[in-house]
Amino acid sequence: MEKTIAINAGSSSLKFQLYDMPSERVITAGIVERIGLKDSIFTITVDGEKIKEIIDIPDHEIAVQMLLEKLINHKVIGSYDEITGIGHRVVHGGERFPESVYIDDQVIKDIEALSELAPLHNPANVTGIKAFRKILPDVVSVAVFDTAFHQTMPPASYLYSLPYSYYEDYGIRKYGFHGTSHKYVSERAAELLGRPVEELRLLTCHLGNGASIAAIEGGKSMDTSMGFTPLAGVSMGTRSGNIDPALIPFIMEKTGKTAEQVLDVLNKESGMLGVSGISSDLRDLEDEAAKGNDRAELALQVFVDRIHKYIGSYAARMNGVDAIIFTAGIGENSSYIREKVLRGLEFMGVYWDPALNQVRGEERFLNYPHSPVKVIIIPTNEELMIARDVETIKNNR
């Protein structure tokens, strides 16, 4: 049996999911947390049972060694030879990587060179890649980029109205993120609608602590709300989303903060947390709003307002919409936010059933049968998309 492992390496974590391919059955999944810190945590699910250990794991290489040993110890695999493919999530591929690629030394250098565009993520992603290559050097390794799916955006979508030389010299442009998720749900929507994705105009709403909207026409990303960084677009858990750029020097002058400190506020202290003053967790805000907390209610209203702006804009851009997709933590689980987003979209042919909306984390159509625009909840599955890309590249080598 051939097995593919999907990896998401963070600076102090390593998430993994092992698939039997090509059946796409999940064999096991888990996470290594607090790598390089005291009391690291290793969690793995075997036969439905979650097993948790606290153990010191000084670096990613040790984490990979331990992960592979645990797969053997728990009889998930008989030997390392059963693993025939490894897929690595990489946050930023820039313009260099419009699709997933086989990893060789040059690809690693290119990903490292792109680290200035994603300083928090790409170095960690590379650390994970190197750790696996050292221990399983002969296994096909594939890099799957968050930005790749959005590389089909036309220049009018991705260029900023800045001196063109900034784009040529520094690569300043919109890149977009959550691409693997947007791609997965758009393909799944086509399956559920029984139509080729090439015929469809889709609005995909990836709503989690980080959130982005995408306009997908003919199976290709035409525009997306995040920009040069994941800070742009809609209001999020702790991120501001779009603001007037002149606010940055204004805030610096008023507060005495440096540009870096202001950026930190925009990334970590803004969004729903900033407006509410309570929490970045939507569940907390829904609870507080239900108790009559005006600021919690306002934070939710701002979130929905920004989503509406993109839905209207992208519907106009594609000259109509065939389906609106909700995915990720909030999109899949919050009937409250879905209701707020869908109310007022009747003008564009969205007719949805409030009774069908009372669901969490379940794949489901929410629209009435006569609705010209379909509304679907599709739980995202980025790990499966990674495993599929590994399988494709492995089979084409």
From Swiss-Prot:
One Pfam family, please name it: Acetate_kinase
SUPFAM superfamilies according to UniProt: Actin-like ATPase domain (SSF53067)
Keyword ATP-binding tagged: yes
- Asked if the keyword Nucleotide-binding belongs to this entry, the reply reads yes
Name the cofactor(s) required for activity, per the record: Mg(2+); Mn(2+)
Query: What EC number is given for this enzyme?
Result: 2.7.2.1
Residues noted as binding Mg(2+) in the record, renumbered to the chain: N8, E382
**Cellular compartments annotated:** Cytoplasm
Positions contributing to substrate binding:
R89
Catalyzes what? Answer: acetate + ATP = acetyl phosphate + ADP
Q: Which GO terms describe its molecular function?
A: acetate kinase activity; ATP binding; magnesium ion binding
Instruction: List the keywords (alphabetical).
Output: ATP-binding, Cytoplasm, Kinase, Magnesium, Metal-binding, Nucleotide-binding, Transferase
Q: In which pathway does it act?
A: Metabolic intermediate biosynthesis; acetyl-CoA biosynthesis; acetyl-CoA from acetate: step 1/2
Site label Transition state stabilizer, positions: H178, R239
Query: Which family is this protein grouped under?
Result: Belongs to the acetokinase family.
The protein here is known as Acetate kinase 1
Taxonomy of origin reads: Bacteria, Bacillati, Bacillota, Bacilli, Bacillales
What's the encoding gene here? Answer: ackA1
